[in-house]
Amino acid sequence: MLDIKYVRENPDAVKKMLEMRLLASESKKIDELIRYDSERKAKVTESDTLKAMRNSVTQEIAKIKREKTGSADELIAEMKIVSDRISEIDAELREIETKQEELLLAVPNILHESVPEGKSAADNVVYKEVMDCKREFDFKPKDHIELGKSLGMLDFERGAKIAGAGFPLYIGKGASLERALINFMLDLHLEKHGYKEVFPPFFVNRDSLRGTGQWPKFADQVYYMNDDDIYAIPTAEVPVTNMHRDEMLQSKELPIKYAAYSACFRREAGSYGKDTKGFLRVHQFNKVEMVKFVLPETSYDELEALLGDAEDVLKALEIPYRVLLLCSGDISANAAKCYDIEVWSPAEEKFLEASSCSNFEDYQARRAQIRFRRQPKAKPEFVHTLNGSGLATSRLMVSLMENYQTPDGKIQVPKVLQKYMGCEVIG
């Protein structure tokens, strides 16, 4: 979340950010937030003044009793009234702080100056295209659904029978290819890019969702287990970022870089009418996530490095892709800047999102209270957090299967995956 001090001192900048994010109607909440902040400060001042008075008079009462110079009954009665008023003020203060925090949690992140202004995905800027490995087919390429069925790799019908639509079932070489992708990506990030592996819980509590910004605003997108008051993770970003919630780090530890595999679960509420066939939109998918905790002054260099780490996966697999710089109307509420990586689907003849790489600056760290000290006795500061998909396997599987298909309906296994698969061709 934003620093209330920043909101108080820069209300116009915050309102401009809301306008750029197509949330101009929320501007009145900034005025309300500042009003609560003024009320809070006034209540704190009043409470502190009365507490100082009570402490002083309490000492006077003790002196009167000790020296037996008179009756302290009148002062005691007055302090009873003062104490009752302090209790009232403190209760009012807690209520104000709760309302202020609710409003502050809902305010999106300030956008980096390099984020282009725009209204929708159509206004995203193509940052780069890497299409030199694009294959030209002399036959009509099949889509991943047809390939998966004909080769006995995927069974969406049985997946739907087991759990419902949007829960794919991998079989045989399909399961092997999925596992190969996960292991390859983890090995690449650990051995080449210097990340530390984490295998996190697939369920988290509300504090964890709050820390990364999915709660309360996006709670309707997450699967919730009511009896246990616990949530299925939408991404490994949530448990991995919260590893350091409420912790004080030292600058010499930074950057901290984690790579984690997890299954991801998303309700995809509001996705009706969108392309939902096959892997294009599912409720459960697999992903390797990269998470960084870095010094504030290095976070944008670290973002470019994070993007490069994700791109290395596609370069090694020789899959065509492009990188988009997301505009103000399409970027997530938590991110200050974000790149999307899209892979090429020959059958669909379009790009499919396979990764997002984001810098949150101190937005998540402030919510999760992840701080560091530059020196042992230095003032604590908030770290900057970043994360990126490295990558999500569902759309990657689509692109891989379609790009590597042969005229006779088989799939060539990319060279970097052959040692994991134990074969060169599927089919």
Swiss-Prot record:
Organism from which the protein derives: Chloroherpeton thalassium (strain ATCC 35110 / GB-78)
One GO location term (cellular component): cytoplasm
Superkingdom of the source species: Bacteria
Any one GO molecular function term: serine-tRNA ligase activity
Matches recorded under PROSITE patterns: AA_TRNA_LIGASE_II (PS50862)
Enzyme Commission code: 6.1.1.11
Function: Catalyzes the attachment of serine to tRNA(Ser). Is also able to aminoacylate tRNA(Sec) with serine, to form the misacylated tRNA L-seryl-tRNA(Sec), which will be further converted into selenocysteinyl-tRNA(Sec).
Coiled-coil regions listed: none
InterPro entries: aa-tRNA-synt_IIb, aa-tRNA-synth_II, aa-tRNA-synth_II/BPL/LPL, Ser-tRNA-ligase_type_1, Ser-tRNA-synth_1_N, SerRS_1_N_sf, SerRS_core, tRNA-bd_arm
Catalytic reaction equation(s): tRNA(Ser) + L-serine + ATP = L-seryl-tRNA(Ser) + AMP + diphosphate + H(+); tRNA(Sec) + L-serine + ATP = L-seryl-tRNA(Sec) + AMP + diphosphate + H(+)
One GO term (biological process): selenocysteine biosynthetic process
Protein name: Serine--tRNA ligase
Binding site for L-serine: T235, A236, E237, E289, S389
Functional pathway: Aminoacyl-tRNA biosynthesis; selenocysteinyl-tRNA(Sec) biosynthesis; L-seryl-tRNA(Sec) from L-serine and tRNA(Sec): step 1/1
Family designation: Belongs to the class-II aminoacyl-tRNA synthetase family. Type-1 seryl-tRNA synthetase subfamily.
Comment field on protein domains: Consists of two distinct domains, a catalytic core and a N-terminal extension that is involved in tRNA binding.
Main location (coarse class): cytoplasm
Subcellular localization(s) per the UniProt record: Cytoplasm
Gene3D superfamilies: Bira Bifunctional Protein, Domain 2, Serine-tRNA synthetase, tRNA binding domain
Subunit structure: Homodimer. The tRNA molecule binds across the dimer.
SUPFAM superfamilies in the record: Class II aaRS and biotin synthetases (SSF55681), tRNA-binding arm (SSF46589)
Record: residues binding ATP: R266, R267, E268, V282, E353, A354, S355, S356
Keyword line: Aminoacyl-tRNA synthetase, ATP-binding, Cytoplasm, Ligase, Nucleotide-binding, Protein biosynthesis
